[in-house]
Design a protein with these regions (language model features):
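A residue-level marker of the well-folded mature domains of exported/periplasmic proteins
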Residues: 3-6, 23-372
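Sec-dependent N-terminal signal peptides
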Residues: 6-15
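C-terminal motif of bacterial Sec signal peptides marking the signal peptidase cleavage site
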Residues: 16-22
Length: 372
């Protein structure tokens, strides 16, 4: 999609949403609520400003809804569960029509969502499923299992595992154990890689074996923190890669972890070139995209979160207007209480050779921003 087409599409979406929305809107600064009437208020709860993607997600959705004539309250919770709960309670007290929630801990929001239900406020889980509550009306996300599968298939192809090549040294990482998506990411990748671990074509020198269904949590990085991933990779390299032993591939579920892992590799003397480990990622964050261009990261799975925001804006509009909310998956996402109707968007693999065609020509980044 060209940049001009992308801009026109966004304008068209906003115009479509605005067609029957009459509420005035006020520009929201940082995380404060907008002023004006709350008759068409939409609450947006994002987990943190510390990751680039959540800043982009929140700003894009907020902008779309405001252009459509809705009043918004956009809140960031600094990755603190109690703070997010308080923010949601405050939003509910303002009588919103819909809450869009990207949760920090998908198991902690049951009581506050019960308050939302009693106030007749509809809830859309944004990208992260909210578990253990019957009061989640819809879920919008990318195909998270496919994200992991694409990472696993990339490793499989680049190492020639299907052709019987190996053994190779693998170090697996998983996302934060309190994020429901992390399990889908890991399982998607592990379903591809596990047979090669069992056959000995992939060896895990650190001993981080994944045998049971919940064992992925043993390699999880709490809060998706780059510095924690870096420290963990440092520990594995120092403890298990001595005497000339080298790591060949690192399964990283997202870019924030990959950033820390790349820093660890660099500090231990790994340099871009034929022997540099395969390193996966997700989100196409700016620093990681630059690392891909510099051969310090092999790939990223790009989830164009603008399209996620576009879809959620349509869902919000349908709810407010009493229309039919579009979903395309009514079977997969069981939150322990109910199967939540979901809309899944497709992720895309990005490598060095197609950064320009996929990320620049789509308008996601400018060439100048990437140094191209």
């Amino acid at each position: 999609m060209t940049k001009n087409f992308r801009v026109l599409a966004s304008v068209a979406l906003a115009a479509s949403l605005a067609a029957t929305s009459a509420c005035s809107s006020t520009r929201d600064e940082s995380s404060s609520s907008t002023g004006g009437s709350t008759s068409n208020l939409i609450g947006i709860a994002m987990p943190t400003r510390s990751l680039e993607r959540w800043n982009n997600d929140g700003a894009h959705l907020d902008d779309l809804l405001k252009k459509a004539g809705y009043t918004t309250s956009l809140q960031y919770a600094d990755n603190k569960v109690d703070q997010q709960i308080t923010q949601l309670e405050n939003m509910i007290n303002q009588n919103p029509k819909v809450l869009v929630v990207a949760s920090i801990d998908g198991t902690a929001l049951g009581p506050v969502l019960e308050k939302a239900a009693k106030a007749n406020v509809k809830v859309i889980a944004y990208d992260r499923l909210i578990n253990g509550s019957p009061n989640v009306d819809y879920y919008a996300t990318f195909d998270n299992y496919l994200v992991g599968k694409l990472q696993g298939q990339f490793i499989e192809e680049k190492l020639g595992l299907k052709d019987g090549k190996g053994p190779f040294n693998l170090e697996p990482f998983a996302g934060s154990s309190d994020d429901n998506n992390a399990k889908f990411f890991f399982n998607g990748a592990w379903d591809v890689l596990k047979p090669y671990v069992e056959s000995g074509k992939l060896v895990i020198p650190s001993g981080k074996k994944i045998a049971g269904e919940e064992d992925w949590k043993t390699v999880s990085i709490t809060g998706w923190k780059s510095e924690t991933a870096q420290a963990e990779m440092d520990n594995r390299l120092n403890s298990f890669y001595t005497g000339g032993k080298k790591v060949n591939v690192v399964l990283s579920p997202n870019d924030s972890l990959a950033l820390g892992i790349a820093q660890s590799l660099e500090s231990k003397g790994y340099k871009p070139g034929p022997d540099y480990p395969i390193l996966t990622g997700q989100d196409a964050d700016l620093a990681n995209t630059k690392n891909i261009l510099a051969d310090k990261q092999s790939m990223t799975v790009w989830k164009d979160t603008r399209t996620l925001g576009d879809q959620v804006a349509k869902m919000v509009d349908a709810i407010v207007k009493g229309g039919t909310v579009e979903t395309n998956d009514t079977k997969t996402y069981n939150n322990g209480v109910k199967v939540v109707p979901a809309y899944l968007l497709p992720p895309v693999v990005v490598v060095k050779e197609d950064v320009k065609t996929k990320l620049v020509e789509s308008g996601f980044y400018t060439a100048d921003k990437l140094g191209l």
